[in-house]
Amino acid sequence: MKIFLTLILLSSSTLTFADGNNDWQNIDDNIFKLNSLNSCQGCLLRNANFIGADLNNALLSGADFISANLSNSNLYNANLEGSSLFGAEINGSNLENANLFGSNLFAVNLYGSNLAGANLTEADLSHANLSGVNLAKANLTNANLRGADLDGAILDGAFLCNTMMPWGVDNSSCQ
């Protein structure tokens, strides 16, 4: 009887977090909004699954993608300025010409992704997996790559000014 009552109570309840917010519903609504409008600025999208998603030219500034999976996604020319992608999986994705100005990419997995021409000014890429990543002509001014894995990364023509690299500050592109 006790198990039956517990099941009834759980089936009629809604999952909420400690602050009382119904974040699971918000995430579903935000995914619908993103799919409909290709825009979801400041949206909560934590732990969401966007594997293989086409988010070409999407407006996602300030979005919360913490621990989301964006592997093999197309984010060409997407605006992710000020977004939080802490711990996200973005391996094998296309972020060519994406705007990631001031974004939090701490401990993100970008293995094999294309960030050619991306704006990573003031981005936090510390402890990120950037192995095999194409960063050609990317702007890394004031970016933090301390502790990042750059094994096999392509940095041809990348703009490095006051860039905190794993080996220290790189000012090779400053004028």
Predicted regions, residues:
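Positively charged n-region of N-terminal signal peptides that target proteins for export
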Residues: 1-5
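Tandem repeat scaffolds
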Residues: 19-175
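Cleavable N-terminal signal peptides of Sec/SRP-targeted secreted and luminal proteins
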Residues: 8-10
